[in-house]
Amino acid sequence: MSAFKPTIKRRESTKIYVGNVPVGGDAPIAVQSMTNTRTTDVEATVTQIKALERVGADIIRVSVPTMEAAEAFKLIKQQTKVPLVADIHFDYRIALKVAEYGVDCLRINPGNIGREDRIRAVVDCAKDKNIPIRIGVNAGSLERDLQEKYGEPTPEALLESALRHVEILDRLNFDQFKVSVKASDVFLAVESYRLLAKAIKQPLHLGITEAGGARAGAVKSAVGLGMLLAEGIGDTLRVSLAADPVEEIKVGFDILKSLRIRSRGINFIACPTCSRQEFDVIGTVNELEQRLEDIITPMDVSIIGCVVNGPGEALVSDLGVTGGNKKSGYYLNGERQKERFDNDDIVNQLEARIRSKVAMQENRIEVSPVE
């Protein structure tokens, strides 16, 4: 609800489609994750994909390292709705097989799947079936000659690797692709993406690879991806965590939400607490986050434990609670309400008000006349 609107001029890029999800151009920045199950375990993989769908994943990548995994992918695709990207290396025949089974995007590096005729076979198949490709360059797997030329992964090395692959697709007259240049070092990744953003017009897939565990990886990704997104660079992203992939989607949306680029669900504004708090702020926020995971309507909710900053935050929130003695003040659309919440029942009362406001907003959207 804040009146202050940041200005982020988004980089101009071409638009492609991964299934029914637009990527690039003026499309919303898509949030992705990747399954970490054995792809041959169809039941486990489908279960994880559906869990990712529930928290808002736009696109999901699945590793397909073998022909056995390709056959499993066929069954997985039949049981899921979200667009699926097949992650493939070395064996071009796997790409051809998953294309038969309805894959929505191929993640390959044209340079590591063999001779020109094999690359052409994959590209021709992608053209015929209208399947986009992601070129995925990674600092940890640079070509040997580039390692020797630059001595170590550098932004220039990652750019040169990416442009090699781009040139292959250009030569084959294929333009339905996106590119990533990932590194585990934040500054290396950021500078590589900056160089790439100037060099090509295709959509960019952002990521800080092998970022780390849930906490450190989230921080690393927020810093790196936040720098790029604030500069208008990026059309889709994945937060890479050594954690439940569901957390990758949550963190991805939190990053976009923090930059006011794309909102999904409740944006909680909560104080870190001190001895002035009149109710259990931390417990309240944690409980509400769990209870309200199903809500996708964007909404700012402030939960502040005392009257020092509470009223000011509540004025720029959709709903707000400001701690008071035994009862706390309640704000709706930035206005103080006569109603006050019992401090020992804030969670239930606030959940009810949030759900009521969401229902009103969704109902208003449904009954709005079509112009």
From Swiss-Prot:
Cofactor(s) needed: [4Fe-4S] cluster
InterPro entries, alphabetized: Dihydropteroate_synth-like_sf (IPR011005), IspG_bac (IPR016425), IspG_bac-typ (IPR004588), NO2/SO3_Rdtase_4Fe4S_sf (IPR045854)
List UniProt keywords, sorted A-Z: 4Fe-4S, Iron, Iron-sulfur, Isoprene biosynthesis, Metal-binding, Oxidoreductase
Q: Which Pfam families match?
A: GcpE
Cofactor comment: Binds 1 [4Fe-4S] cluster.
Residue numbers binding [4Fe-4S] cluster: C271, C274, C306, E313
Q: Which Gene3D superfamilies match?
A: Dihydropteroate synthase-like, Sulfite Reductase Hemoprotein, domain 1
Looking at the UniProt entry, the stretches that span the membrane are none
- Pathway listed for it? Isoprenoid biosynthesis; isopentenyl diphosphate biosynthesis via DXP pathway; isopentenyl diphosphate from 1-deoxy-D-xylulose 5-phosphate: step 5/6
Task: List the Gene Ontology MF annotations in alphabetical order.
Answer: 4 iron, 4 sulfur cluster binding; 4-hydroxy-3-methylbut-2-en-1-yl diphosphate synthase activity (ferredoxin); 4-hydroxy-3-methylbut-2-enyl-diphosphate synthase activity (flavodoxin); iron ion binding
> What biological process terms from GO does the record include?
isopentenyl diphosphate biosynthetic process, methylerythritol 4-phosphate pathway; terpenoid biosynthetic process
On whether Chaperone is a keyword of this UniProt record, the answer is no
Q: Which reaction does it catalyse?
A: (2E)-4-hydroxy-3-methylbut-2-enyl diphosphate + oxidized [flavodoxin] + H2O + 2 H(+) = 2-C-methyl-D-erythritol 2,4-cyclic diphosphate + reduced [flavodoxin]
What task does this protein carry out? Answer: Converts 2C-methyl-D-erythritol 2,4-cyclodiphosphate (ME-2,4cPP) into 1-hydroxy-2-methyl-2-(E)-butenyl 4-diphosphate.
How is this protein named in the record?
4-hydroxy-3-methylbut-2-en-1-yl diphosphate synthase (flavodoxin)
Q: Which gene encodes it?
A: ispG
